[in-house]
Curated annotation (Swiss-Prot):
It catalyses: UDP-N-acetyl-alpha-D-muramoyl-L-alanyl-gamma-D-glutamyl-meso-2,6-diaminopimeloyl-D-alanyl-D-alanine + di-trans,octa-cis-undecaprenyl phosphate = di-trans,octa-cis-undecaprenyl diphospho-N-acetyl-alpha-D-muramoyl-L-alanyl-D-glutamyl-meso-2,6-diaminopimeloyl-D-alanyl-D-alanine + UMP. This is Phospho-N-acetylmuramoyl-pentapeptide-transferase. NCBIfam families: mraY. It is a multi-pass membrane protein. Its EC number is 2.7.8.13. Its cofactor is Mg(2+). One of its GO terms (biological process) is regulation of cell shape.
Length: 358
């Protein structure tokens, strides 16, 4: 919005020329997201408490979690506001990739909101059924990926980390593959959101990493030099990624141990879906497995646990997802959280290193 209002004035007032620079608008998207979080945060928490939108704690989980009972949830509403407002203010709103990403983030946020509202406000313990959630997740992801491939003409080739000349073309199989990336990322982040600040930290780190890759993907010279896929217009996603980083840090202010508010499904599903569609648009789908390694491990721990118990009658972990396994082994919650953040930073650096290690 500000881009469209103020940049045209650059012809008469040179100061407004700064609005053409992605770096300037990205930095201020981060700052705006932080400001929105700090201004709206206390108000959102009070409203959630008034709605009695309080987290229900599993009785079969770690005993230390019982004291969290009654903490407001659905704080993902604050995250969404802190992403959408800066994006609308600082991004080029004629960019199709910005709107596609917002469509996925808000669509998945609506799924999570509906599930959370049924569970914590209407006291319907079932919420949305797994089938219902999966249906809507697949529908939204399918709509977004079909638009990108069939309308926007996005390449269906894959970029394989560490191999600069390996670009397998999936053709129309790319559509179900892209859907899998978005849905998988969404649910993986959802499974990770089990400790105070555990999910939002890695999400912010992932968003910062994709900020860099979006900027490179949208720059013809940089993408050619680094031999990464060139996606005209993808650079504008750096602004949205900046908003995600700011929103993540701003939410962490309230979600850090001991948490004042939880993000709920409205936050975890939307953030995961956002990371997934960012990976698809920037043509770094496989890189998401590296930078989002914590989310991958969390999801795999649940899959292996369920599979092992179903077919062998034995559990691999004391409890899944794996962060609960470490809790039951006696590792303090804050230590688990910070260690997972550190691992994510290392994985992000490895992901960035693939720009030259080819």
């Amino acid at each position: 919005m500000l881009y469209h209002l103020l940049y045209p004035l650059a012809a008469d007032f040179r100061i407004f020329n700064v609005f053409k620079y992605l770096t300037f608008r990205t930095i201020y998207a981060v700052i705006t997201a932080l400001v929105v979080s700090f201004i709206l945060g206390p108000w959102v928490i009070r409203k959630l408490e008034a709605l009695q939108a309080r987290q229900v704690i599993r009785t079969d989980g770690p005993e230390s979690h019982l004291k969290k009972s009654g903490t407001p949830t659905m704080g993902g509403i604050l995250i969404l506001a802190s992403i959408v407002i800066p994006t609308l203010l600082w991004a080029d709103l004629t960019n199709r990739y910005v709107w596609t990403t917002l469509f996925v983030i808000l669509g998945y946020g609506l799924i999570g909101f509906t599930d959370d509202y049924k569970k914590v406000v209407e006291k319907d313990t079932k919420g949305l059924s797994p089938r219902q959630k999966m249906f809507w997740q697949m529908l939204i992801a399918g709509g977004a990926v079909c638009f990108l491939v069939l309308v926007a003409g996005m390449s269906t080739e894959l970029s394989v980390p560490f191999f600069k000349r390996l670009h397998p073309d999936l053709s129309y199989l790319y559509i179900p593959f892209g859907m899998l990336v978005v849905v998988g990322a969404s649910n993986a982040v959802n499974l990770t959101d089990g400790l105070d600040g555990l999910a939002i930290g890695p999400v912010a780190i992932n968003a910062a990493t994709f900020l860099l890759f979006a900027y490179i993907a949208g720059n013809a010279k940089l993408s050619s030099y680094l031999q990464t896929p060139y996606v005209p217009g993808a650079g504008e996603l750096a602004v949205l990624c900046g908003a995600m980083v700011g929103a993540g840090i701003g939410f962490l202010w309230y979600n850090a141990y001991p948490a004042e508010v939880f993000m709920g499904d409205v936050g975890s599903l939307s953030l995961g879906g956002g990371l997934g569609i960012l990976a698809v648009i920037t043509k770094q789908e496989m890189l998401l497995v590296i930078v989002g390694g914590i989310f991958v491990v969390e999801a795999l721990s649940v899959i292996f646990q369920v599979g092992s118990y179903k077919y062998r009658g034995k559990r691999i972990f004391r409890m899944a997802p794996i962060h609960h396994h470490f809790e039951l082994k006696g590792v303090a919650e804050p230590k688990i959280i910070v260690r997972f953040w550190i691992i994510t930073i290392i994985l992000a650096l490895v992901a960035i290193s693939t720009l030259k290690l080819r």
